[in-house]
A protein has these predicted regions:
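Histidine-acidic metal/acid-base catalytic patches
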Residues: 1-60, 64-66, 76-77, 83, ...
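Short alpha-helical segments and helix-capping/turn motifs at coil-helix boundaries
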Residues: 31-37, 78-82, 108-119, 165
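Surface-exposed, active-site-proximal loop segments in enzymatic domains
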Residues: 59-66, 103-111, 137-158, 183-196
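Active-site loop/lid in soluble adenylation, ligation, and acyl-transfer enzymes
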Residues: 75-78, 90-101
Length: 433
């Protein structure tokens, strides 16, 4: 194995001349469109998307999970893996933690002090926390089988609330600034739950969590149209989510997971409405074909990802007060090296962001005012079809990253090295990580 830095240096040296040629060609193209390529490189350099701690391990399905070599066994090892991704792509300096999977130990390796030290050494920070009340944990007094924050039994709801408060405390110790709540509460059969009462209990539980938020924190909630409950999910669409957030409190905002919608829903229109309502908190980026597939971002529907960023960039350029969405990848890497998937996904998200900055906003506004549907689509497609790869690579190089992150990663031999140091994890039946 060679170090990541050595791999980047060697691989970049072999690719630099080609990058310079491609960059110069794109620069001339963009000049004809009166676009400053250096400004786009600066935007790509400044873009940030967080990595989920659970994303560096192998995912799975409800049928099976097939462990990969060198999977991280502890939070410290997850930090090491996230550090590798960041060293190569340079847009992922923050992590999101899931409790209790990432709960710090009381003392020794894995305690708060050692976690903070490892984060500092890897150039990372903790951005957000995530609670888990969709699984029962060993030794847990009460079960979430029939719900958590919306359970009919107050004692179960109180247990779920206390778990979220624990997440806030851990996050405060580690420097986080937001907390995300997703629940699997719902029903599999008609009549199983009382729809209105369940929402009432949900809002009441969230209000208790919202009241305990540390200063400067935001609370994100996300809906899901189905799964794990299949007849009804308590928080089943974006409208219900928005109304609940409004009831909960000013710092409760909507988080959009691209896979949590019904098939063919116009997600970019939902994003636009949340921006208008000043209710957009952030994103969990992934891709899907049929449901909440959690595939690599941009792998199936890259144009949809671009259209989402078209709305986000439009709001950014307009300077809408309070517009500061948090971006994170949320994926399940079942058949790939998770670090490679995270690198590719991060690059695809930045790609969509930069492409959205290529949209001729004045021309688009004119086409919309004139009801010129064909011209409007042409303007969007012109931006989407522009290959901005040289811009993304130049931004990475500027920050010390790799021209081709996956190639440099493979050349380093990192996966084989950690595989020899980390014993294989047993396959779990649930496929959940």
């Amino acid at each position: 194995m060679i170090t990541i830095a050595e791999a980047v240096e060697r691989d970049n040296a072999a690719r630099r001349a080609t990058l310079d040629e491609d960059y110069a060609h794109l620069e001339r193209q963009l000049e004809r469109r009166h676009v400053d390529i250096k400004a786009l490189v600066a935007r790509a350099t400044a873009f940030r998307v967080a990595i989920p701690s659970w994303g560096v391990g192998t995912g799975g399905t409800r049928f099976a999970r097939f462990p990969g070599p060198g999977e991280p066994r502890t939070l410290l090892e997850k930090i090491d893996d996230c550090g590798v991704v960041q060293s190569l792509v340079r847009v992922t300096p923050a992590m999101s933690l899931h409790i209790p999977w990432d709960k710090p130990r009381e003392s020794g390796p894995g305690d708060v002090a050692s976690i903070r030290a490892r984060l500092l050494a890897r150039g990372l920070a903790i951005e957000s926390m995530n609670s888990n009340t969709f699984q029962d944990q060993p030794g847990q007094p009460l079960s979430y089988k029939f719900g958590s924050l919306t359970h009919t039994d107050f004692a179960v709801r109180r247990q779920a609330i206390e778990h979220n408060l624990e997440c806030l405390a851990i996050g405060r110790d580690l420097g986080a600034s937001s907390h995300t709540v997703w629940i699997g509460d719902g029903g599999n059969f008609p009549g199983q739950i009382h729809f209105r009462h369940a929402i009432d209990r949900y809002v009441e539980s969230l209000q208790a969590i919202h009241a305990a938020l540390p200063d400067g924190w935001r609370l994100f909630i996300e809906h899901k149209c189905y799964e794990p409950a299949f007849y009804s999910t308590v928080l089943n669409d974006w409208g219900i989510r928005y109304l609940c957030a409004r009831e909960v409190g000013d710092r409760c905002l909507s988080l959009v997971d691209l896979g949590h919608h019904a098939p063919n829903v116009n997600i970019e229109q939902i994003v636009a409405q949340l921006i208008r309502l000043r209710a957009l908190g952030g994103f969990h980026f992934n891709d899907s074909k049929f449901g909440d597939d959690d595939l690599d971002s941009g792998s199936i529907k890259p144009f949809q990802l671009f259209l989402v960023f078209n709305e986000l960039v439009d709001a950014e350029l307009e300077g809408i007060p309070g517009f500061a969405p948090a971006y994170m990848l949320d994926q399940s890497h079942n058949v790939t090296d998770p670090l490679e998937s995270l690198m590719v996904s991060a690059m695809e998200v930045v790609r969509a962001y930069v492409q959205a900055h290529l949209v001729d906003r004045a021309a688009l506004a004119e086409a919309q005012a004139n009801n010129d549907a064909v011209r409007a689509l042409q303007i969007l497609k012109a931006a989407f079809r522009t290959d901005v790869s040289p811009i993304l690579a130049a931004a990475r190089v500027r920050e010390g990253g790799a021209i081709d992150p996956v190639a440099a990663y493979r050349a380093s031999g990192y996966r084989a090295s950690v595989a020899s140091q980390r014993p294989a994890l047993a396959s779990g039946g649930s496929g959940i990580v």
